[in-house]
């Protein structure tokens, strides 16, 4: 399918990026929800979170279109809002796990931590795919260590 033929179905580039972003958002939320749904202890969170980060990184490395979608969302205010809403939704899955693990913790603090960890993860992935592969791998490993230290803190 050529780019020109896409414009038969979409009025402009923004509409194409929006449709791709919505599709990716739905698929990623289903994956994240499934991965975190059964987590009941710190070890399970560590494993599930690490696997999700690795999947996300591999996806960005394997699918250049993901980079294009991200670039397109950054260039458009409405698309940035879509991405922000997606990030909040994904952070809610993480918050649910944190609440199960720390039922007496301040819920607002857990929400803030989950949202910030999620946003930092997205930034870490973008940085990792912008540098040489070996450095990107190190950055992703460092992010996982830092994020898990915060998520698993008592």
What residue spans do the PLM features occupy?
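Hydrophobic alpha-helical bundle segments that form small-molecule/ligand-binding pockets
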Residues: 37-42, 62-68, 73-77, 88-114, ...
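Helix-turn-helix
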Residues: 1-15
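Hydrophobic/aromatic-rich alpha-helical bundle segments in the mid-to-C-terminal region
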Residues: 71-72, 80, 100-146
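Hydrophobic alpha-helical connector segments
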Residues: 15, 19, 23, 33-61, ...
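Short, structured helix-loop boundary elements
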Residues: 14, 18, 42, 46-50, ...
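An amphipathic alpha-helix signature
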Residues: 46, 50, 54, 88-95, ...
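Non-catalytic cap/lid and distal C-terminal segments of serine-dependent acyl enzymes
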Residues: 82, 88, 92, 96, ...
